[in-house]
Amino acid sequence: MAKNPKILSIVLAGGEGTRLMPLTRDRAKPAVPFGGVYRLIDFPLSNLVNSGYRQVVVLTQYKSHSLDRHISQVWRFSPLLGSYVSPVPAQQRLGKHWYLGSADAIYQTINIIEDVQPDIVVIVGADHVYRMDFEQMVQQHIESGAEFTVAGIRQPIEESNQFGVIEVDHDHPNMIKNFQEKPANTTGLPDNPNQILASMGNYVANTKALFEALSLDEKAADTKHDMGGDIAPYFASRNEAGVYDFNSNEIPGSTATDHAYWRDVGTIKQFYDAHMDLIAYVPEFNLYNQDWPIYTMSGNLPPAKFVHAGRDRLGHATDSIVSPGVIVSGGEVHHSVLSPNVRIHSWAQIVDSVLFDGVIINRRARVYKAILDKNVVLTENSTVGIDTEHDLARGFTVTPDGITVVPKNTIVDD
């Protein structure tokens, strides 16, 4: 391995995101807005760029127009310096079909890897919220001698059926003894039976070994063509898979509260809970860490504005994130996230909610524990999240946890 290996990063952004419906009705999951001004794709891309990796390929597939547009507008580098973030749609180079899985997505674009000729390929997912210095993971990968390294994080054992589960070789703690993808039953860690070591869906691989594994997987009869379900177990079975403990990753500017923060936001509840993490007095994930910034489009929007100061008509927001272009005009906002260009009119109430761009809440309307997609309009005195049966009757999504989701461009008129 060269002292300064050539590295290509691949972001797997082709997931359909069915569990996030209706937020993914009109967009790819990585293009879903998050945290007021960001999109989910901004988190892995920011981590790669902050790690010094600026040759990035983003593999897209379903409903990718808004994702492609966001990447082309925000993630532009100078080609003179050899830097790029390049969206690559499904090519159908080796068969007239969509990607059959994450491993097949990489195999179908293997010509791009061959053109770059990297020593190492860094592979990351596009639907998690976290900060990570991938350079630290790459250095451990090189030092360990592994052909393939998986990033691992501790998770509750009751969630083992949602993750790839890593069993570490106790004689060689940086190596994987066994890897199971989403097992129905498993055992906990030796030092904590209530936890497992879960795969984060981030991988580092030596290029030659990765090519060999992908080629074998493509020809195999019993495969789902999945990085976690097939490629990781393949390397583990050959004693060639390492594990990187995410808890050891050090980020400049991080605090004890948000150290090693990582959230899968693949369901409505996870997506909602991750937003609530942002707005605590001491947030579990600190968006304001400028030593490791999350990049996105800044836009040409004016500052947020709060107007009316009457005793019963005070425009204000507490324990909330308020984005540029927002006007709170005599309404009340509490414990919520307001995206750009939201309008809150007099005597309206927004509590425990997430409002995407361009939402308009008219007078005396009320929103509680809800996610409102772009350009939703609530007419005067209308409600969302107050009456579950009424919300369901109007065709809104209501989760078992009581989170109401209103689709894009809906006019809510009670």
UniProtKB/Swiss-Prot annotation:
Keyword tags: ATP-binding, Carbohydrate metabolism, Glycogen biosynthesis, Glycogen metabolism, Nucleotide-binding, Nucleotidyltransferase, Transferase
Record: residues binding alpha-D-glucose 1-phosphate: Y99, G164, E181, K182, S199
GO molecular function, one term: glucose-1-phosphate adenylyltransferase activity
PROSITE patterns registered for this protein in UniProt: ADP_GLC_PYROPHOSPH_1, ADP_GLC_PYROPHOSPH_2
Enzyme category, top tier: transferase
Function: Involved in the biosynthesis of ADP-glucose, a building block required for the elongation reactions to produce glycogen. Catalyzes the reaction between ATP and alpha-D-glucose 1-phosphate (G1P) to produce pyrophosphate and ADP-Glc.
Protein name: Glucose-1-phosphate adenylyltransferase
Highest classification ranks of the organism: Bacteria, Bacillati, Actinomycetota, Actinomycetes, Bifidobacteriales
Chain's gene name: glgC
